[in-house]
Amino acid sequence: MAEELIDIYDEKMNLLGTATREQAHREGLWHTSFHCWIVRRSPEGRPQVLLQIRGKTQNHPSLIDISSAGHLAAGETAHDGIKNIEQELGLKVDFGKLVKLFTANHVFQKNNYINHEFNPTYLLEDSTPLPEYKLNPDWVDGVFIADVEDVLNLFKHKVDK
């Protein structure tokens, strides 16, 4: 099976060509990864977010992650990123329902893994009950809903669980 090719960019997001994901992470080449935060309101009106627990065979296994994310293959745009939501969570989404928030520049390095990503980041308001999600066990071990305030407090180290 041929390795997946992804588009490679310069630091200003000008397209340069393609490379494999492995090469991009080995050499620190800029590429794109679609991000989507799925949000809703609790019955009491509190803002909430859907978070996933990454699959055991994924990078950063069994850790909490955003609602849905994934690399964009060569030639794909953020519009094509909705495929990740269906592949991971079994949720079919109309791209028109997404709200573009921003494009983040993500830089991370650990040992021989160098990640330089542009992350077009979207918001989706969706109240699908958790039992209706069809999780792909290759990518996702579980999902849960958390109050946004609790997640922010965790990020700010105000709570540890």
Report residues per predicted region.
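Short hydrophobic "helix-edge" motifs at membrane interfaces and signal-peptide entry regions
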Residues: 1, 57, 137-138
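Short loop segments at secondary-structure junctions
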Residues: 12, 40-44, 55, 125-129, ...
